[in-house]
Amino acid sequence: MDAQSAPSGQVQVRFTTRNEDLAVGDTPIFVPTSLKRYGLSQIVNHLLKTEKPTPFDFLVQGQLLKTTLDEYIVQNGLSTESILDIEYIQSTLPPAYLASFSHDDWISGIQLTSDTILTSSYDGIARVWDKSGEIKFQSTGCGSSLKSASWHIPNQSFLTASLDQKIFHWVIEEPESMLDAEKKSSGILQTLFVGHKDIVERVRSLESSSVFISASADNTVGIWDFERSPETTLESFSSSISKKRRRKNAEFTPQAGARSPLILCEGHTGPVMDIVFSDDPSVAYSVGQDHTIKTWDLITGQNVDSKITKAPLLCVEKLTDLHLVICGSSARHIVVHDPRAGSDKIVSHTLSGHKNLVSGLSASPENPYMFASVSHDNTCRVWDVRATSGSIYTISRAEKTGSQWDKLFAVDWNKSIGIVTGGTDKQLQINQSSSFGKSE
């Protein structure tokens, strides 16, 4: 009997899950082929014998089931005489739009804490926002557009990376009295880090370490230390700031002077676009326009592994619990890579759906399988690596500019604020749902 002759028949299915707490056993059972997601969810809940039903989504051969089983079987040329393996995952609600905060120029970087949003912009200014949209701190513009920002100590100090090859370390000073409590915090330019010979595309730091890392268009990865990086002169920095502006703004002189990198790591043959720490803070992964994913020993500065992919890579993020690295490419897809020693696959699989290059990635703060991406197609997409057929949700811009050229550059995602995105429309957009991103 085939699916064509028995569209309302039955098929044997084997329900599977990667969450042991929700497992129902692997014994195949017969179910009507007329069932969709809701009917299958009822069956799984019945097998689980839970007091409160849990909504589930279902994956068949990596595809989210959006039709009846019968339609899926017919469309994919399968037989009802074979056992159909169906993976179930907890459903999530679409991320709801909450708010947008306006910038004066393009938004290039975003990093969240539990109650603040750090942004970098092409106007050369870094801003710290609270969740209501109030600017709590604003850095002084240093004469060049910013490409990236990273908290060192949340709500106390952060780094910015610029088009003019520099990295700035800012320290936030809180108001001294209750009378000043409603004013913006003031800031100190603490240290200038110099050494790259081209745009610093990305800077990343960890609160638990004095070491931070950078990716540059000069084909190098920078390893720096707030305490151990060698001191150097301020001449090149001073020459880029006009005398009038230096007299007017004492903030332009870094209080702790300038420092050079511990190591500039060579190995990429094209611009390095992004870098991320591994779970081991002495290891990092970088990606570049030379199509490669490289693994670095941050103690020695050595490139310990390199994988070549089919397209230039523009951004990178880690999925900690899965021991995977995801990379956004100029070919519009997302590469899922296993960097562990002994993994002989260059690419585990790819995820497709964006209509332009993928410019930013951020892992879900709660669900180990999920992450968000942004693209020059001006959308943010939410993915589950188990669903290989495409993204789960697409988040469009809430405020339309009417320009077909708008692009998104940056995304970050945490539990307390949500998914925050920004780009050429100058809008910092926040999307969140109370149950969105819940881990299984």
Curated annotation (Swiss-Prot):
It comes from Schizosaccharomyces pombe (strain 972 / ATCC 24843) (Fission yeast). Component of the NOP7 complex, which is required for maturation of the 25S and 5.8S ribosomal RNAs and formation of the 60S ribosome. The modification Phosphoserine is found at S242. WD repeats lie at residues 102-139, 141-180, 195-234, 267-306, 308-347, 353-393, 403-440. The modification Phosphothreonine is found at T140. Its main location: nucleus. GO terms for cellular component: chromatin; nucleolus; nucleoplasm; nucleus; PeBoW complex; preribosome; preribosome, large subunit precursor. This is Ribosome biogenesis protein ytm1. Component of the NOP7 complex, composed of erb1, ppp1/nop7 and ytm1. The complex is held together by erb1, which interacts with ppp1/nop7 via its N-terminal domain and with ytm1 via a high-affinity interaction between the seven-bladed beta-propeller domains of the 2 proteins. The NOP7 complex associates with the 66S pre-ribosome. Interacts (via UBL domain) with mdn1 (via VWFA/MIDAS domain). The keyword Cytoplasm does not apply. Keywords: Nucleus, Phosphoprotein, Repeat, Ribosome biogenesis, rRNA processing, WD repeat. SMART domains: WD40. The lineage of its organism: Eukaryota, Fungi, Dikarya, Ascomycota, Taphrinomycotina. It holds the Pfam family NLE. Residues 11-90 are annotated as: Ubiquitin-like (UBL) domain. One of its GO terms (biological process) is assembly of large subunit precursor of preribosome. It is found in: Nucleus, Nucleolus; Nucleus, Nucleoplasm.
